[in-house]
Amino acid sequence: MGTSMRHVREIFLAAALMAPFAVSAQDRQSDPKAFSLRERIPQEQWIRVRNLNGAVHVRAATGDQVEVTATRTWRRGDPKSVRIESRKSSDGSILVCALWTEDTVCTEDRYSNNDRGRRNRDDDNRNDVAVDFEIRVPKGVKVGVWTVNGAATVDGVTSEVRASTVNGSVEATSAGGPVQASTVNGSVHAKMGRLDGDQDLSFSSVNGSVVAEFTGDIDADIDLSTVNGSFQTDWPVTITGRIDPRHLRATLGKGGRRIHLSTVNGNVELRKR
């Protein structure tokens, strides 16, 4: 529902890169010092972290620096085969990527594969190494976190958030905003404080409920959709178009920015904090 072909292609690419990682946590070995970074990032610039197998957790920093640490765990894979790289942009933003194959390229927008090293793909497919990121972010720094197998959680931040996974739930809270959040297999729960600007917002899943919470009254055009589930909104709305049990288009307040919540299997809720 609303999933672009580009999004679908990126999901399949990520799946091809990551391999069947799922194994029991029992008997897994751990390297809690796989990666560490501490840097100052200017306010309104980004810390972006991309991962394929493992969780990404973000919380507030106590100082004025962004801190990123990573823990590698594995049972039968080679932890040294998974490298973690970072680079800083001219605007002060930082990108951190976990890379499972030599031919994987990571940018601010996505992972890609340059198709070199395909002879090593069978070995890659037996690599069960997971990387869990812990990130601490000071006030005013924007956050972008993406993974494939694992949860994405963001709490205690004050600026824009983009959070996404494929297999796992997403919980994203910002005292400011805006927040964008998505998954395929899992729930989405987003919370925002003030809502400045007029940027459109999107929250989506396929198998899981989607909840977005806002502080105070908002002016927006909302688009809610589910196939197997129900709608709920804490605000009175003016319905636009025909009444459809699977798709609700309505206006909140004076209307304005578009807020889109969608899933296939699950409920869709727009809540007032």
Where are the regions that the model predicts?
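Intrinsically disordered, low-complexity terminal regions
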Residues: 2-273
